[in-house]
Amino acid sequence: MPARFSAALLAYRTGDQGPEVFLVHMGGPYWAHKDEGAWSIPKGEYDPTAESAQEVAAREFGEEVGLPAPSGPWHDLGEHRMPSGKRVRTFAVHTDADLAFVSSNLFTMEWPPRSGRVGEFPETDGAEWFELDVARRKLVSGQVPILDRLADAIR
């Protein structure tokens, strides 16, 4: 099976209690009533022979949040291998922008499984700022090590 690659952009800011990160809540019926472990860093798959990780990270942020990626210097947090084997290249950007969820692109899937009914659902259905300790609980478990990389990078 060929390797799968994703690129991500983790926006962060300095809050009253320390660093805060901007995460998106995964959309679709499976995630609708879940909170802890149901949030993600905006990201998307790409072919590294056809696109740059930075271009994809910016595009995916826009698609999943509905706003352009924050401007400012991007910090390369490197590549992280997910439990699925997918390789995620993450960039971080500090921002003072008042980011908020606007809209998300849609995807099509059969729901409930094996029902024969196909519907369109938002890829993400919300976004919020979280302090790092809270973000560790909210974030899907495979992405939590990325928060450690951010914490190390901004010390």
Give the residues covered by each predicted segment.
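N-terminal strand-loop-strand
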Residues: M1-I41, A69, F91
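Short, charged/polar surface micro-motifs in flexible loops or helix N-caps
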Residues: G15-G18, G28-W31, D47-P48, S84, ...
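Residues that scaffold the ATP/ADP-binding catalytic core of kinase and kinase-like folds
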Residues: H33, T49, K138
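Short glycine-enriched loop/turn motifs at secondary-structure junctions
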Residues: S40, G85, E120-E123
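The catalytic Nudix box helix
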Residues: I41-L77, F91, E131
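NUDIX/MutT-family hydrolases
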Residues: S104-I146
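C-terminal/domain-terminus segments
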Residues: Q143-R155
